């Protein structure tokens, strides 16, 4: 049988090969990550809770004072931990991206998964041998030296972009995010129950961390032995490019791809001066929008675990797991949002919808007093994942396929660096304001989210419809 399938509207399309699907790697690694994140928070809380009790046994303090002290200790731990997680990949992530582009696409994925596994083993040994929590800084550094999440996710995005056409790329990348969200939801839902399986000071969290190590091991073995690199989707070279549509939708994705514009001009639509190719300012504006928005998201995500442990919410282990799972439902709703909005909106419009969604939810989160209010605020953030994923998709249409690895690594490292600064800043703001207005960090995130709309609006203004099919050029 022929390796290709004929499509009357698009010519020859490559046959689907299940071994090229990166989703199993994403799912298993994310289950491991969600179990690890919940386990890390609960283990650190238990460690500082025990230390706090012993240090103040001789001079009893009010419960509120002890809670504040524990919150500050956990916050200070995460400041250092996030600094290590954010800075350590700088030594290796770009190099792995370059090696992936030059030699083999799986290099960055496999190396970063090895680092994931080693860091999960570090948490397991901390629980098993009752090591001090400072050991986890070393585990995080080891993870970063193997590329960390920056190298892993840029490799995943490169594989997803490589095997998809421009018109399908937004859905392809958001589908990978959907798989990540579903896996994170399942892992978070189970995390609180797994943490409580072995009670007692020495065994608490052992089953949870062991499950995390098992999932990380599966992801590494699958990427090494099963995963294959997909073939690049070639563009038609001698005919007007067909409009790329998404199965089951009425409209089309509006493309930013300069090559399609060149092909259209070659068949009778000559470009006017300055309009042949998108300016570099478009990529720069997309970068700025992604970074400002990521500041808001990372700050909120970093503060939420501390916020839910403190009064007035004061959640237990199971409630913490459920709260983390609620955050992962955003992956599902964002995927559905892309499918619906792509029928009638351009990429820039979808990005702004997501930013408004997150900014509104963060503003509500600042005034949460009850558990049900927390879930309402999270529900308002239902499209919060759309912006960064759609920005990646738009950028991939402006660069050559051979540069996917390097460009995605640069973007991911930029987000990681801003995340390091944001984590430190937000944790310090939280410590200073938790007695006055505990929701101040969420209010700041809301402001930054709406601020990120400005560069995206400029990109949208520079785009003008060229044809009824939705192709766009710049002013």
UniProtKB/Swiss-Prot annotation:
GO terms for cellular component: cell surface; endosome membrane; membrane; plasma membrane. Keywords: Cell membrane, Endosome, Glycoprotein, Immunity, Innate immunity, Membrane, Transmembrane, Transmembrane helix, Transport. It is a multi-pass membrane protein. Glycans are attached at residue 55. Strongly expressed in the adult thymus. Expressed in spleen, lymph nodes, thymus, PBL, bone marrow and fetal liver. Expressed in monocytes and pre-dendridic cells. Residues 1-23, 100-108, 160-172, 227-282, 342-347, 392-406, 457-475 are cytoplasmic. It is found in: Endosome membrane; Cell membrane. Induction: Up-regulated in keratinocytes upon differentiation. InterPro entries: MFS, MFS_trans_sf, Tet-R_TetA/multi-R_MdtG-like. The keyword Manganese does not apply. The keyword Transmembrane applies. It catalyses: N-acetyl-beta-D-glucosaminyl-(1->4)-1,6-anhydro-N-acetyl-beta-D-muramoyl-L-alanyl-gamma-D-glutamyl-meso-2,6-diaminopimeloyl-D-alanine(out) + n H(+)(out) = N-acetyl-beta-D-glucosaminyl-(1->4)-1,6-anhydro-N-acetyl-beta-D-muramoyl-L-alanyl-gamma-D-glutamyl-meso-2,6-diaminopimeloyl-D-alanine(in) + n H(+)(in); L-alanyl-gamma-D-glutamyl-meso-2,6-diaminopimelate(out) + n H(+)(out) = L-alanyl-gamma-D-glutamyl-meso-2,6-diaminopimelate(in) + n H(+)(in); N-acetyl-D-muramoyl-L-alanyl-D-isoglutamine(out) + n H(+)(out) = N-acetyl-D-muramoyl-L-alanyl-D-isoglutamine(in) + n H(+)(in); 2',3'-cGAMP(out) + n H(+)(out) = 2',3'-cGAMP(in) + n H(+)(in). Belongs to the major facilitator superfamily. SLC46A family. This is Solute carrier family 46 member 2. The lineage of its organism: Eukaryota, Metazoa, Chordata, Craniata, Vertebrata.
